[in-house]
A protein has these predicted regions:
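A glycine-rich beta-to-alpha transition motif near the start of alpha/beta enzyme domains, typified by
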Residues: 1-164, 176-315
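Glycine-rich ThDP/TPP pyrophosphate-binding loop and its adjacent helix/strand module
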Residues: 169
Length: 315
C-alpha cells in the first residue's frame, strides 16, 4: 500500500485530517455510490486514519477528489469515527484552511472562494486571509430546518425527555442540559456521554426521512444546549456527542446550522442576526440565517457559519 499523505488541523479545538494523496479513490459515478463502496471495500482505511494509534477519539478525515459535478472545486467524502457523514462543518473549515496553506488553489485574493460537493449538497466557503495567513473561514451550508418540536422519548436513567429534531447537514436531537441538570464541562464528560448514548439509542429506533432526500433518515447526533456559558458575550453553550460517544471539542458546524434553524423557526432569531455558539472549550462559531423559504409546510433556512482552523501537522 502506498503511503497516505495528509495535513492535520484543528477547527476551534476539533481535529481534521485532509487526505492529499495515497488513498485509492473509488471510480463509482455518484458520490453516494463511492461512499457505499468505501463502507463495503475500504472501511479499514477510515479506521487506520481516524483510530489509534494514528488518530484519536475525535479525528475526522476528508477525502479530496476531483469535482464530480459542474460548478464545484472538489468533491469530498467525510469520514468520522463511526460514520460517513453527509456534511461536517468543522471539517469543511479545516479543509478550506488546509487547501490555502498547501497552495492548492489558483485564486489568491481574499476572500478565496471554494465550492465543495458533499452528500448534503454544495457547500460554498470563503477563506478570509490576513497578513498572508488564514484569518477565518465562512461557509454557506446546505438547507437546514426544524423537523420536530418537543419530540418525546423515554430513557432508562433520565426518564422522559423532550427533544427538538433539526437538520443542519446532519440530523440532531437538541436537548436542554439545564433541564436535565447536566453540567456541560469537560470534567463531566462521562455523564454527558452516558446521557447522549441513551438519547441516541432511542432516536435510532425510528427513521426521520429528509423531505428532499429519503436516504438521509437517521438521527444519531445529540446536541446539548445550556445558558451557562464560559464567556457571557456568547449566546449559548453547546456540547455535541457523536457515536460511539465522542464529544466534539468545537461548537460543531452542522450542529450550529441546526441550532440556528431551530431558533429561527421558533422566532428567537432574526434574518442575518448573529448567533455566537460556544463549544466545550469556550471557542465559538458564529452562525446566522441568510435566507429562508417555505416548501410543503417546512421552513427551510440557508445558514452561514464562521470559524477558525489551525494547521497542526503534515504526515
Amino acid at each position: 500500500m502506498k503511503p497516505i499523505q495528509v495535513i492535520d488541523s484543528h477547527t476551534e479545538g476539533n481535529p481534521t485530517r485532509v487526505i492529499l494523496s495515497g488513498f485509492p479513490i473509488p471510480k463509482n459515478k455518484t458520490l453516494l455510490e463511492r461512499v457505499n463502496y468505501l463502507k463495503k471495500k475500504q472501511d479499514h482505511l477510515r479506521k487506520i486514519l481516524n483510530h489509534e494509534p494514528r488518530g484519536n477519539g475525535m479525528m475526522c478525515s476528508v477525502l479530496l477528489m476531483p469535482p464530480m459535478i459542474k460548478g464545484c472545486d472538489y468533491s469530498v467524502i467525510i469520514m468520522e469515527q463511526d460514520e460517513y457523514v453527509p456534511m461536517c462543518g468543522h471539517c469543511i473549515i479545516g479543509t478550506a484552511t488546509t487547501l490555502v496553506y498547501a497552495k492548492k488553489l489558483k485564486q489568491k485574493k481574499s476572500p478565496v472562494t471554494i465550492k465543495f460537493h458533499t452528500l448534503a449538497g454544495i457547500v460554498e466557503c470563503k477563506v478570509h486571509i490576513k497578513n498572508g495567513n488564514v484569518d477565518y473561514v465562512s461557509f454557506v451550508n446546505a438547507e437546514s430546518f426544524l423537523l420536530h418540536q418537543n419530540y418525546k422519548i423515554k430513557t432508562k436513567n433520565y426518564g422522559k425527555i423532550n427533544v427538538d429534531i433539526a437538520y443542519g447537514g446532519d440530523y440532531y436531537a437538541i436537548v436542554s442540559a439545564d433541564k436535565l441538570k447536566i453540567k456541560l464541562n469537560l470534567q463531566n464528560d462521562q455523564e454527558i456521554i452516558r446521557c447522549a448514548n441513551e438519547i441516541s439509542t432511542e432516536m435510532l429506533k425510528k427513521k426521520f426521512p429528509h423531505p428532499k432526500n429519503k436516504k438521509i433518515n437517521r438521527c444519531y447526533m445529540v446536541q446539548f444546549i445550556s445558558n451557562k456559558r464560559i464567556h457571557n458575550k456568547n449566546n449559548s453553550k453547546t456540547t455535541v456527542v457523536a457515536p460511539p460517544g465522542a464529544i466534539d471539542r468545537s461548537p460543531c458546524g452542522t450542529g450550529t446550522s441546526a441550532r440556528v434553524a431551530q431558533l429561527f423557526s421558533k422566532g428567537k432569531l432574526k434574518l442575518n442576526q448573529k448567533f455566537h455558539n460556544e463549544g466545550p472549550l469556550g471557542t465559538k462559531f458564529i452562525g446566522k440565517v441568510i435566507s429562508s423559504k417555505i416548501e410543503n409546510k417546512i421552513l427551510y433556512i440557508r445558514p452561514q457559519v464562521s470559524g477558525r482552523a489551525y494547521i497542526t501537522g503534515i504526515n
